[in-house]
Structure formats: structure tokens, C-alpha cells
Amino acid sequence: MKYDIIGDIHGCFQEFQDLTTKLGYSWDSGIPIHNAKRRLAFVGDITDRGPHSLRMIEIVWELVINRKDAYYAPGNHCNKLYRFFLGRNVTIAHGLETTVAEYEALPSNKQQIIKEKFITLYEQSPLYHILDEKNLTVCHAGIRQDYIGRQDKKVQTFVLYGDITGEKHPDGSPVRQDWAKEYKGETWIVYGHTPVNEPRFVNHTVNIDTGAVFGGKLTGLRYPELETVSVPSSLPFVPEKFRPIS
């Protein structure tokens, strides 16, 4: 099986449509389908900050749950939206407010449909995907070699948030260590979470979050070819979001 792994979309539907078209997918049926039987995989954070979060929920639900023709690994924004839909006490900020505004603008019956679709998508998707006979792992913020195969709380925190130190940047965002430099495994780890100006290959890891929602690009990785394909963002560039990893 060949895969096209998509970086953090954050509600940027137009960029997603442009990228999948560039990757050879047809939208004739209203969702991206590849005639060469390639499958999409998502590194999470499909919602928040961008203009079309609910559209992305519907598309990813259709591909992953209804058609079982794609893979989705939830991100930290997905986790927070899931908790919001469960009625938990979450702070509606850091991008969640845009998704909530879209959601609250819907009539109640459509709200229920979106809520049920996302809860199902989240609950039926693993923390990370191990694909291609264990040669490929798709996850949100990365994973250490010795964590692969585990599902405990420590691993969940790492996969959703990265190798956080507990310290904060001046803007309140967490300081993260560069775990990829220490990775010695043969399995390819494809992830996102931390915006970079260009896809970042370090050892057998690739960060494909090129900051579409911050005016960068939306990037996909063709696997096993290990070729990156990007489309430009239509949103304003926010340079401070593209900081060094550590």
C-alpha cells in the first residue's frame, strides 16, 4: 500500500483540496479519491484556527469511518475538541473558538450530526498508526522509538504534545526538546504539530507541519517515495509561529 500523509490542516479546506488534487486525487464524488489506490493519512489537528473546520470533520469522517479508506491520528486540538463535545470544562481559546463559532452557527440537528461524527472519529482512531509492516508510524507530535507499541498516559502526552519540558515561551507556548535528533529507529516517523518553514527530515523522522494556518504551506508526504508535495496557504503569514524546535 502507498500512502499520502497530510500535515496539520487546521480547517484550511481549500488548501487541502488543492494539495490532494496536486497529489492526483479526484474530487468528482465530493471527497478525494485516488485511482491508483493510494490512501490518505492525517497527522491530526484537522480543525481550529482555519475557516472550514466542520467541513474537514465531515470529509475525514467519510474517508476514515464510513469508507475505511484513510487513516487519522488525533492531535492535541482534536483531543480538546473531543473533550468540548463531551461537555467537559475546556478553555475555548487557542483556535478552538473558531471551530466552536462554526458549530454554534448550525441548527441544533446539524450540531448533533457533527458532534456524533467527530466523537466517533476520535474514539475509533488509535493514538498513532503503525503501517507498512511496521516500517511507518503516523502520529501527531512524534514518538520515541521505545514508546512504539505503548498506549499509556506518558506516551499519550508525548504523541499529542511532543517532548515538552514543562517550561514556557514568552507567548505561553510550551518549550519542546528536539526528540528527532535522538531517534535511532529504522521505522519512519511522520508527524506534525510544530510548524516548520520546510518539511524537516531528521534521521528516520519527517515533520510535515509547514504551518498552513499561519500562512506557510500545506504539505503532504508521499510514502514510500518519501517525496514532499506542498501548496501555498491563502492566509496571512505569521512568522513568530515558525520558531526553532528547542
UniProtKB/Swiss-Prot annotation:
The keyword Lipid metabolism does not apply. Keywords: Hydrolase, Nickel. It catalyses: P(1),P(4)-bis(5'-guanosyl) tetraphosphate + H2O = GMP + GTP + 2 H(+). GO terms for cellular component: cytoplasm. GO terms for molecular function: bis(5'-nucleosyl)-tetraphosphatase (asymmetrical) activity; nickel cation binding; phosphatase activity. The keyword Hydrolase applies. It comes from the Bacteria. InterPro entries: Ap4A_hydrolase (IPR050126), Bis(5'-nucleosyl)-tetraP_PrpE (IPR023937), Calcineurin-like_PHP_ApaH (IPR004843), Metallo-depent_PP-like (IPR029052), MPP_PrpE-like (IPR041780). SUPFAM superfamilies: Metallo-dependent phosphatases. Its EC number is 3.6.1.17. It is an enzyme of class 3 (hydrolase). Its cofactor is Ni(2+). Belongs to the PrpE family. PANTHER family: BIS(5'-NUCLEOSYL)-TETRAPHOSPHATASE PRPE [ASYMMETRICAL] (PTHR42850:SF7), METALLOPHOSPHOESTERASE (PTHR42850). Asymmetrically hydrolyzes Ap4p to yield AMP and ATP. NCBIfam families: PRK13625.1 (NF010148). This is Bis(5'-nucleosyl)-tetraphosphatase PrpE [asymmetrical]. It comes from Bacillus mycoides (strain KBAB4) (Bacillus weihenstephanensis).
